[in-house]
Amino acid sequence: MPPILLTFLLFSNVYANFMNMLMGSSSAPLQQYRAYAGCSSSGCVPATIVPKSSGFWPNADMIAGLQTEQRSQNQNQNSNNPQQDDPRTSQSTGQINGNVPGSSSSNQQPVIYIARAGSDKYKNSEVTTSTPTPNGFNFGNGFQGGQNQNTGFSSGFFNNQNQNSNQNLNQNNFQQNQNLGASSGFFNNQNQQNSQQNQVNGPTSGFSNQQTSNQNSGFFNNQNQQNGQNFGNSGNQNGVNPYSGAFSNGQNQNQQGFFGNNQNNQQNSNGQVQGSQNNQIWNQNQNPNILPFGPNLVNSNTQFGPQPFQPIQVGSIRQPFSNKDWNFQPGGQAVQFVGGGGSGGAPGSQSVPMTDEAQQIAVQIQAIRDNLSITRNESNYLINQLKLSLPQELQNQLEMV
């Protein structure tokens, strides 16, 4: 056979295989996708759960699993697959997506998809660095990373981190409260100091004389580091005029504006805000590369720059995982199971013991909660969807997880 003809046939074969792979119709057999197959002897980790629409695939096993799932979405090959209907619960509850055996249509609602997480060579998702990004949704720190504690969006949902010291020398028959760092709106504040020491006992009137420091404003946090506003109908105990009315003679220092820090070091007799340094959207004394809202999914010092707010995207192929997100083994002592019967010293107990399958699902739930590349709301949504897609006996075992 002439060499040029042999080269042409070889090229044709390679091209045909490449096009079949692109079209999802490769004749090469793929390993059967099993949601709860466990780990092989090669040392894989249990299944990892990611949203189907995220576009985030840490390794080739997930891509192969998705291809197999798409090819067999109208077949019920595995009753444990949460993307397919369980005949005991699907028609009565409608909680499981997929196709009931024997039916001709499928409920197309892409929710979640479970795939085996693969070997260690995919541990960092095609990136070489192992340093996690400092920005984004970190638990307890809301819309900013843990290194930013003085900007508007500084703390998480319903998570007070007040470090105030309160010295209340007032004698008020009705209320002796100094509400320091009182939360209002959707975000709480991280107040770090309180310099209000009220030593003047002005005339009280009814339920007035309520001295509130570091008061929140609207939906954003005011992190006032000194004196805030003095509220009340009358009898505000201000050092200038003890008979002042509401909002008068307030000495507002470092009072925040609506979007940024108004660093006001002036004494204001009207109780209004006079921001001498209004930095608008973000603080000048903070990192100028960090936006005060939205997850920064990529380091701001890279070529991609700060990313806009993308609530649907839960990860990036460029973002590495920390090692702890991949070190889960079914029944391992490193995982704390919440619910009876599991290993690792469960803080709670149940009457129904956990089966091996339920323990592996508990490992997946733990992996969702510890994964810093998604938000808490997204992880709670995934966990709820996962539980709803399981048979009822597994839901009972995972009730407290």
UniProtKB/Swiss-Prot annotation:
Write out the GO biological process terms.
nematode pharyngeal gland morphogenesis
Which residue stretches belong to region Disordered? 70-109, 122-303
Q: What are the TM regions of this chain, as residue ranges? A: none
Q: Where is the composition biased (Polar residues)?
A: 89-109, 125-134
Amino acid composition bias (Low complexity), ranges on this chain: 70-84, 135-181, 188-239, 247-289
**Tissue spec. comment:** Expressed in the pharyngeal glands.
Name listed for the protein in its UniProt record:
Prion-like-(Q/N-rich) domain-bearing protein 8
